[in-house]
A protein has these predicted regions:
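N-terminal phosphate/diphosphate-binding loop that engages ATP/GTP or pyrophosphate donors
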Residues: 4, 18-93, 97, 102-105
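Hydrophobic anchor at the beta1->P-loop junction of P-loop NTPases
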Residues: 7
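Conserved glycine(s) of the Walker
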Residues: 14-15
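Short internal beta-strands
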Residues: 38, 143-146, 171-177
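Switch II (G3) loop of P-loop NTPases
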Residues: 99, 103-127
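Inter-motif core of Ras-like GTPase G domains
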Residues: 126-149
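C-terminal lobe/tail of nucleotide-utilizing enzymes
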Residues: 160-228
Length: 228
């Protein structure tokens, strides 16, 4: 049976892709056929191969099962803004059925599929659909990425509560050091351990620029996911 997870974050730019790549690496090391899925991505660049998003490309590189870019990222937008805004501007609606079909295709090939969201938990995909709505429909277990900085405790508690209210399992969380650790870093982590009702899968240290290029799977312990 395919293991399926959804990665969300406490905010945008908290390192969801860094954590997702680490998860894919760690699962591959456990012997799984892995694939990462970025169904919706904004902030992309035109290349000789067409519009490409750096986060989706990172997931593609870190998947053990080769996939064409279109399978990894069915909705790609150039402007780095909320998906519901840019999709409306371009007249290209985001269809939940397309997201689900893409997920089914990957699940048929891999035994460990990780879907990475965009922005935070309630990121709108249209005037009537949020990413949270789709995840709830798919009944995906959730992994929360916390960008460790001032304010992250409140954001983590709010997101964990929202996941719980959606009736979805929060199966783990990852602390991602998105800046050099400050004086209160240890206290932030200690508090997060107390207030997030899920096991800590690991802490990814501050790696400077281009952290998605690093071998980050070593920082994670997936045994709580194996037991779930």
């Amino acid at each position: 049976m395919t293991k399926r997870y959804f990665v969300t974050g406490t905010d945008t730019e908290v390192g969801k892709t860094v954590a997702s790549c680490a998860l894919l690496q760690a699962a591959t090391q456990l012997g799984y056929q892995t694939v990462g899925y970025k169904p919706v991505a904004s902030g992309s660049e035109m290349t000789t191969d067409g519009l490409r998003n750096s986060d989706a490309l990172a997931l593609q590189r870190n998947s053990s099962l080769p996939q064409p870019y279109s399978a990894i990222n069915p909705y790609t937008f150039a402007e780095p803004t909320s998906p519901h805004i840019v999709s409306a501007d371009e007249g290209r609606a985001i269809d939940a059925a397309v997201l689900s079909r893409g997920l089914r295709t990957l699940e048929a090939q891999a035994d460990w599929v990780l879907t990475e969201g965009a922005g935070g938990w309630f990121t709108p995909l249209s005037a009537t659909l949020t990413f949270a709505d789709w995840v709830q429909t798919e009944q995906l277990p959730v992994i929360l990425v916390v960008g460790v900085k001032l304010g992250c405790i409140n954001h983590a508690m709010l997101t964990a509560l929202a996941v719980e209210q959606a009736g979805l399992p929060l199966v783990g969380w990852i602390a991602n050091d998105i800046q050099p650790p400050g004086a209160r870093h240890g206290e932030y982590l200690a508090t997060l351990r107390c207030v997030i009702p899920a096991p800590l899968l690991g802490e990814i240290p501050w790696l400077g620029v281009s952290p998605s290029q690093a071998a980050t799977g070593q920082y994670l312990d997936l045994s709580p996911l194996e037991r779930a």
